[in-house]
Structures are given as structure tokens and as C-alpha cells.
């Protein structure tokens, strides 16, 4: 059984990044067990390896961190559950297949949202998890950006629970101009973070056996 570790309070992004990277090194060199960090960050904009500077619009006094994960700009802050799985894809019960790993992440989050009555989708050529908000119009509810070192995964998924969605106006989220973002709260689903965490742990064990 993989251990889920909840980081208390609001976590500084750079401190958490170092925590992840240090543990990845331990998994690689010392064969430490797989773990998953559950985090709620202080406000921060992060840029993945495919970012374009013009996609950073008006960040005000919110810090901007340039990371090594895949993807473009996104926002992290209170009310958002960020999940950092540190999994060894080279282990006998996993697969050395990054596309399969991302597909499993998507299925995991879609199933977790479905528990709360939210029908979520993946959309071709648009990374992340989406929900239909109006006829033929979708909004992103979860962002995905991962990195792998020697087949050990880090970074992960950010799901908007009760996030201040106005903060996304400081960027072009994930490089998708005019795209909408949403949250469980905005969809009328009010859930405590601890309750959400229980469901994602249950659903994880169904997908990542």
C-alpha cells in the first residue's frame, strides 16, 4: 500500500520542490518506497518547460517559479489540492511508459470527480481534466504536469476544489488562450479537503494496483 503524506498548512512551492527532488533521489539510489505528497500551496505561478513568456500576463505580487515539469503556466494556491506521486515506473508492478502513466493519472482524477457527481473529460490536444459548463463549452478543473527521472515520477496533478479562480487571469493557463477554469465549488460541490483526500486515495488503489 502506497503511503499518502499530507503536508500541513500552506506549503512554499520551492520547499516542496526540494522535498520531492530529494525523495526522488532516494527512490533511485536507495530504493525507498513509493509515496504520494498531498499539498496545498501558498499562491504561486509555475512555468513548465514549454512555457512562453507572453503567456504570463499580470502576476502582480504573486511569485513566479520556473520548474522542470512538463507543460506551461499554471497557478497554485489555497483551496487547490496538488498531488505529487513519486512512483517507480521501472518496478515490476509498473510500466516504463510515460503516456500510459499520464492516462492512468487522468483516469484516477476523472473517477474521483465522478464520485462527487462531476462528469469529467479529457479533450484531444488539451492537457488536463475538463468539465462541460455550457453547451459545447468546457472548463478545466485539473491540470497535469509531470516529470520523470530514471523512470521515477514527480510533479503531478492540481485539482481546483475551492480555489480563487480569479488568480488564473494573471496567466494564459497551460497556454490555452480563452480557455475557462472551474472548481468543485463553482460547480456547486462543496467538499472539505480531507473528504476529497479520502476519495482520491480510494480511487488511486483501483487504478494503480
Curated annotation (Swiss-Prot):
Pfam families xref list: LplA-B_cat
Active site as annotated: 174
Pathway noted in the entry: Protein modification; protein lipoylation via endogenous pathway; protein N(6)-(lipoyl)lysine from octanoyl-[acyl-carrier-protein]: step 1/2
Site-annotated residues for Lowers pKa of active site Cys: 140
Subcellular location: Cytoplasm
EC numbers on record: 2.3.1.181
GO MF terms, alphabetically ordered: lipoyl(octanoyl) transferase activity
Function: Catalyzes the transfer of endogenously produced octanoic acid from octanoyl-acyl-carrier-protein onto the lipoyl domains of lipoate-dependent enzymes. Lipoyl-ACP can also act as a substrate although octanoyl-ACP is likely to be the physiological substrate.
Miscellaneous: In the reaction, the free carboxyl group of octanoic acid is attached via an amide linkage to the epsilon-amino group of a specific lysine residue of lipoyl domains of lipoate-dependent enzymes.
Family recorded in the similarity comment: Belongs to the LipB family.
Name this polypeptide is given: Octanoyltransferase
Species, as recorded: Rickettsia africae (strain ESF-5)
Record gene name: lipB
Amino acid at each position: 500500500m502506497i503511503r499518502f503524506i499530507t503536508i500541513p498548512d500552506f506549503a512554499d512551492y520551492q520547499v516542496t520542490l526540494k522535498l520531492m527532488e530529494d525523495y526522488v533521489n532516494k527512490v533511485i539510489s536507495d530504493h525507498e518506497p513509493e509515496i504520494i505528497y498531498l499539498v496545498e500551496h501558498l499562491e504561486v505561478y509555475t512555468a513548465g518547460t514549454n512555457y512562453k513568456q507572453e503567456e504570463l500576463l499580470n502576476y502582480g505580487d504573486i511569485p513566479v517559479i520556473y520548474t522542470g515539469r512538463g507543460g506551461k503556466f499554471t497557478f497554485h494556491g489555497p483551496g487547490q489540492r496538488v498531488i505529487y506521486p513519486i512512483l517507480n515506473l521501472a518496478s515490476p508492478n509498473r510500466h516504463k511508459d510515460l503516456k500510459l502513466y499520464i492516462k492512468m493519472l487522468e483516469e484516477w482524477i476523472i473517477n474521483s470527480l465522478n464520485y462527487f457527481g462531476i462528469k469529467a473529460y479529457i479533450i484531444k490536444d488539451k492537457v488536463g481534466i475538463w468539465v462541460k459548463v455550457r453547451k459545447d463549452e468546457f472548463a478545466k478543473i485539473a491540470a497535469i504536469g509531470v516529470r520523470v527521472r530514471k523512470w521515477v515520477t514527480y510533479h503531478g496533478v492540481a485539482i481546483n476544489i475551492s480555489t480563487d479562480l480569479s488568480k488564473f487571469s494573471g496567466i494564459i493557463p497551460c497556454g490555452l488562450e480563452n480557455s475557462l477554469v472551474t472548481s468543485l465549488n463553482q460547480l456547486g460541490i462543496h467538499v472539505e479537503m480531507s473528504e476529497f483526500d479520502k476519495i482520491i486515495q480510494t480511487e488511486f488503489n483501483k487504478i494503480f494496483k
